[in-house]
């Protein structure tokens, strides 16, 4: 099951930052990397990705530059800035605290009769 339509607000930005933290990537490479690091559980649509990339560049969290892709096509590559690295660290810590709190709140579920 893919969770593409069930991402919480802000989660896409975090996933993009995480994907790019592993090295500069073009848009399609970011889509593939998110799929890879999530075990293909998270599949992001291009229509959602590119507005997120533009937003992160405007915020100074990503830097974009033109380069050549593996198939010799011109592509825009994205990489983390120092501010992006800091935001990724902060948001990852926040996400981990939230996931722990939700896990504790849900606790063990009683078996259905």
Show which residues each predicted segment covers.
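A cross-family signal for key residues in well-ordered alpha-helices
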Residues: 18, 32, 51, 89, ...
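N-terminal helix-turn-helix DNA-binding core of bacterial DNA-binding proteins
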Residues: 5-48
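Short beta-strand/turn micro-motifs at beta-sheet edges
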Residues: 2-6, 66-67
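Short, structured helix-loop boundary elements
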Residues: 46, 74-77, 92, 99
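Amphipathic alpha-helical dimerization/coiled-coil segments
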Residues: 86-113
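Beta-hairpin "wing" of winged helix-turn-helix
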Residues: 57-74, 79
């Amino acid at each position: 099951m893919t969770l593409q339509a069930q991402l919480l607000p802000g989660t896409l930005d975090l996933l993009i930052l995480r994907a790019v933290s592993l090295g500069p990537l073009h848009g399609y490479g970011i889509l593939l990397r998110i799929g890879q690091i999530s075990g293909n559980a998270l599949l992001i649509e291009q229509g959602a990705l590119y507005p997120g990339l533009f937003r992160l560049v405007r915020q100074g969290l990503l830097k974009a530059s033109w380069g050549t892709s593996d198939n010799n096509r011109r592509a825009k590559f994205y990489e983390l800035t120092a501010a992006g690295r800091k935001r990724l660290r902060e948001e990852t810590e926040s996400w981990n605290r939230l996931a722990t709190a939700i896990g504790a709140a849900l606790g063990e579920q009683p078996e259905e009769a």
